[in-house]
């Protein structure tokens, strides 16, 4: 491969391609003369569209094929939505850069109603996320929550066709696709705690590829990386995959990390919450200790049920 060429493995959804082009533009701005090529591919998560993600099982539904391309040297980097990135990486690969975070909140989207609380009893709300489901069901047990799969455009079409009264999407994805006008309300973390890494774009590469790591260094956003480190440390201890009823959100306020997390029963009957505040250098340990607290307070039993009896130790 030529020294001035960098290949990006990416999914082919409009949002994934936006993220890949975002990284491409940042790289070319930082390194004039660099030629950046996209290597689009299809992942298992893109193909299995008729089953709720939680039932598909497995981790890395949206990243495995990209990682194989890295290992086989068909690409140099893979660009991911951080909320899709598993807690473990194949040997030789790792997350080396996290770009500046977009708005991490969930979005309430409806053609008829202005807010979650304005929905009449019995309204049908679409989401494929157990994390969103459990928080919705806790706040509004009178709603009917149905699975919703597909890319952002597909989900909006299903709403527009009348299959749902409202759907929940990520604010970041809608903003990136120029669809911010579809957001009726951004849900604060107190109502819908975001997913681990939500709104952040991560870049994975071969750990022994010094040239690529050097090119990527300029794209790393230190504050976002600290926040996502705390969130992912918590998720790692909980052995969380992409599709589990786990929420985690870290903010950096006055030089201190404030980490909030929850584990919920998908039907909203029980949600275990906790939080930590501490120094940025302790981000990883904070995440681990908060996870331990959640496990001891009942999260272990909830996760055992979700994982079919295989709970975190």
From Swiss-Prot:
Gene3D superfamilies: Periplasmic binding protein-like II, Porphobilinogen deaminase, C-terminal domain. The keyword Transferase applies. Its cofactor is dipyrromethane. Its EC number is 2.5.1.61. Pathway: Porphyrin-containing compound metabolism; protoporphyrin-IX biosynthesis; coproporphyrinogen-III from 5-aminolevulinate: step 2/4. The keyword Transferase applies. Binds 1 dipyrromethane group covalently. Pfam families: Porphobil_deam, Porphobil_deamC. GO terms for biological process: protoporphyrinogen IX biosynthetic process. Belongs to the HMBS family. Tetrapolymerization of the monopyrrole PBG into the hydroxymethylbilane pre-uroporphyrinogen in several discrete steps. NCBIfam families: hemC (TIGR00212). Monomer. This is Porphobilinogen deaminase. It comes from Escherichia coli O45:K1 (strain S88 / ExPEC). The gene is hemC.
């Amino acid at each position: 491969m030529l020294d001035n060429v960098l290949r990006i493995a990416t999914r082919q959804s409009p949002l994934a391609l936006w993220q890949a082009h975002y990284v491409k533009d940042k790289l070319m701005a930082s390194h004039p003369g660099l030629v950046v090529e996209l290597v689009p591919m299809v992942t298992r998560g893109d193909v299995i569209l008729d089953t709720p993600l939680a039932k598909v099982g497995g981790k890395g539904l949206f990243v495995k094929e990209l990682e194989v391309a890295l290992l086989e040297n068909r690409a140099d980097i893979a660009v991911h939505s951080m909320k899709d990135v598993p807690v473990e990486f194949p040997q030789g690969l790792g997350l080396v850069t996290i770009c500046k975070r977009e708005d991490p909140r969930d979005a309430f989207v409806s053609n008829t109603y202005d807010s979650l609380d304005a929905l009449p009893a019995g309204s049908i709300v679409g989401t494929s996320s157990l994390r969103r489901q459990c928080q919705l069901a806790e706040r509004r047990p009178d709603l009917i929550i149905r699975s919703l799969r597909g890319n952002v455009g597909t989900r909006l079409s299903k709403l527009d066709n009348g299959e749902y009264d409202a759907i929940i999407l990520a604010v970041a994805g809608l903003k990136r696709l120029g669809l911010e006008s579809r957001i009726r309300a951004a849900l604060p973390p107190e109502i819908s705690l975001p997913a681990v890494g939500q709104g952040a774009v991560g870049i994975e590469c071969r750990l022994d590829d010094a040239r690529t790591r050097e090119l990527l260094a300029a794209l790393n956003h230190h504050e976002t990386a600290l926040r996502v480190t705390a969130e992912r440390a918590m998720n790692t201890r909980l052995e969380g995959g992409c599709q589990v009823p786990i929420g985690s959100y870290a903010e950096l306020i006055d030089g201190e990390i404030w980490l909030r997390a929850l584990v919920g029963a998908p039907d909203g009957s029980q949600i275990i919450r906790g939080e930590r505040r501490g120094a940025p250098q302790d981000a990883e340990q904070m995440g681990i200790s908060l996870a331990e607290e959640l496990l001891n307070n009942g999260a272990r039993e909830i996760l055992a049920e979700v994982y079919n009896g295989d709970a975190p130790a």
